[in-house]
Design a protein with these regions (language model features):
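Contiguous, well-folded functional domains in the mature portion of proteins
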Residues: 5-169
Length: 169
């Protein structure tokens, strides 16, 4: 708790001179360790380190100021390049590409500059569940190896106002 408060106050940035960048929760729900995702591609960090969120609602927001690199046409995932350089992948549910976009409504396009908190995707979580698919949403930093500091904050309910990843080069 004390460490988190010191991070928020910028203590470590002042002490060590490293800028700390924050990635906020893109979807409201319970933040869990990436290892809890029932898909080894995500759980074993093959695409990068991060967290996952068990969503409480079906709105995906920009987790920081960024540029949309790829908005998948099916709406099930989006990759962003954060202004700080982090390459972020948000994958809504597992195996949801097979739903062919039906439960998704996209609100951004490739190349769009987005601000933290801007709506990117809406998803009908009930439709995903009715299809028998998990709604757990991995949030990855694909270039996580580029960072010397990589902290995740899990085990609690989060909204777009909560930092879930902090990183520094």
């Amino acid at each position: 708790m004390l460490e988190r408060m010191l991070f928020q106050m910028g203590f470590f940035k002042k002490l060590f001179g490293k800028p700390v960048d924050s990635i906020y929760a893109p979807i409201a729900g319970k933040a869990v360790p990436i290892a809890e995702v029932p898909d080894p591609t995500f759980a074993e960090g093959m695409l990068g380190n991060g967290i996952a969120i068990e969503p409480a609602e079906g709105k995906v927001y920009a987790p920081c100021d960024a540029t949309v690199d790829t908005m998948f046409t099916t709406g099930h995932a989006v990759s962003l390049v954060a202004d700080c350089g982090a390459e972020i992948l948000i994958h809504v549910g597992l195996e949801t590409v097979g739903l062919e976009g039906k439960p998704f409504k996209v609100h951004a396009a490739n190349g769009d500059k987005v601000k933290k908190g801007q709506l990117l995707i809406e998803v009908d979580l009930d439709a995903v569940k009715e299809a028998g698919l998990p709604t757990i949403t991995p949030v990855l930093v694909c270039n996580s190896d580029d960072y010397t500091t990589f902290d995740t904050f899990v085990g609690k309910n989060v909204t777009n106002d909560d930092a879930v990843i902090e990183l520094a080069k």
